[in-house]
Design a protein with these regions (language model features):
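Conserved N-terminal substructure of TIR/SEFIR domains
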Residues: 144-160
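Cys/His-rich microdomains that often coordinate metals
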Residues: 10-13, 31
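Residues immediately within or flanking Cys/His clusters that coordinate Zn2+
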Residues: 3, 21
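Short Cys/His-rich micro-motifs in 6-15 aa windows
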Residues: 28-37
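Short coil/linker segments at helix-helix boundaries
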Residues: 37, 87-142
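Short cysteine-rich clusters marking metal-coordination/redox-active sites
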Residues: 6-9, 24-27
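Alpha-helical segment of the N-proximal tetratricopeptide repeat
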Residues: 39-66, 70
Length: 160
């Protein structure tokens, strides 16, 4: 059986055959997983996730694009593109100890209206769709907060 690493902490996920979600035995997060039907695809996912965790979002997105080109119905690859587009890294919340998303790239565009996110929802099953929506709502709240803060900042000039 394939070993899939947690998107949040890097621990091994508890996999159940045929399931589209898994629970991390270390941090307890429930998350979506790719279809486990192809070893080549799983290796590509592993490499893309490693790059994304290192905040190499453009390189990771390139690998996710390759996966999407080869496997058009793979919701997890589209989700990887979304995470890269918004520069999502999961960090420890000092208050709760849980992993929460942080955005390294801000955008005026809503994650809920993103074309790749629409592909995620279209290609995901019911269980995975619920997890994707919950994570997207969390990311959307962060994005809105960033936009609100930037709207209240004084304009400034930069001289080089």
């Amino acid at each position: 059986m394939a070993i899939i690493k947690c998107k949040m902490c890097g621990g091994e996920l508890i996999l159940i055959d045929g399931a589209s979600t898994a629970e991390c035995e270390f941090c307890g997060s429930v998350q979506t997983i790719p279809n486990l039907d192809d070893e080549k695809k799983l290796i590509q996912f592993e490499r893309a996730e490693r790059l994304r965790k290192q905040c190499e979002f453009d390189k990771a997105a390139g690998i996710y694009e390759t996966i999407v080109a080869d496997y058009r119905q793979e919701a997890e690859a589209y989700w990887g593109l979304v995470l890269c587009k918004y520069g999502i890294e999961y960090v420890d919340d000092p208050a709760t100890g849980k992993k929460i998303p942080t955005c390294h790239r801000s955008s005026f565009d809503s994650i809920m209206e993103d074309g790749d996110f629409e592909q995620v929802l279209e290609n995901a099953d019911v269980m995975a769709r619920k997890v994707y929506r919950e994570e997207a709502k969390q990311i959307e709240e962060i994005r809105k907060g960033i936009i609100a803060v930037s709207a209240n900042e004084e304009p400034y000039d930069i001289f080089i």
